[in-house]
Regions:
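Surface-exposed loop/turn motifs in large extracellular/passenger domains
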Residues: 1-7, 17-35, 41-84, 89-110, ...
Length: 213
């Protein structure tokens, strides 16, 4: 708790859980600068993370504020990704945000088939068990500086929003995109890699398109 963590190299996350581990953190100041370096991250075998308070910023390409292959709960924290999706959840895992600020700016990348703020997916890399991905956000704010908001592909997924103050990008490409993909990283077999999505909004204002196939 009450600690500053700064990383500068690629694949150097801020705080990390894997192999079924448990991590509890409070009031950290975390900044990562390399590629594939999420401020809050997990890896194979998952685990549990409980985070209360603090600031978590990722600045590198492909470095979300939260990369989730575990069960992660974050409350009363500021989360920001400057060159990536803000949140990536893969496979049978969950992220719960309560009274957090979440923002992101993602540059265009030819490997991506769309630009989103929160993505729930299955990469088939083996980093996570296949199953339903869960994202919930209550209170706080969500800011998108470009592209769309919520994207899910090649997985079962569920979203829950309540009382979130949303700032949309100027283009507001989509509110929710629930489709297959032709991603160059190989997220399932094209034509067979759609998403089965449940989206629940509770006393939530929303605007934008819903795309599905």
């Amino acid at each position: 708790s009450d600690t500053t963590i700064t990383t500068k190299q690629d694949t150097s996350g801020g705080i990390h859980v894997a192999g079924g581990g448990t991590l509890t953190a409070s009031n950290l100041t975390v900044e990562t600068n390399g590629e594939s370096s999420a401020a809050i991250r997990s890896d194979r075998g998952g685990g549990t993370m409980t985070i209360n308070g603090g600031t978590y910023t990722s600045k590198g390409t492909g470095s979300p504020a939260v990369y989730c292959t575990a069960d992660i709960t974050v409350s009363d924290a500021a989360l920001s990704a400057e060159n990536s999706e803000a949140v990536c959840i893969e496979g049978l895992n969950s992220l719960s945000l309560k009274n957090c600020t979440l923002s992101r700016n993602i540059p265009e990348n030819e490997q991506n088939d769309c630009d989103s703020t929160v993505i729930l997916y299955q990469s088939m890399s083996g980093d996570s068990e296949v199953g339903e991905s869960n994202f919930s956000m209550e209170g706080g704010s969500l800011t998108s500086l470009n592209g769309g908001l919520f994207y899910t592909t090649n997985t079962e997924s569920s979203f829950y929003l309540k009382h979130v103050d949303i700032t949309y990008s100027p283009s507001n490409d989509f509110f929710l995109k629930c489709t297959g993909n032709a991603n160059k990283r190989g997220w399932g077999e094209s034509g067979k890699n759609g998403a089965d999505c449940t989206f629940t909004a509770d006393e939530q204002e929303m605007s934008g398109s819903i795309l599905w196939d």
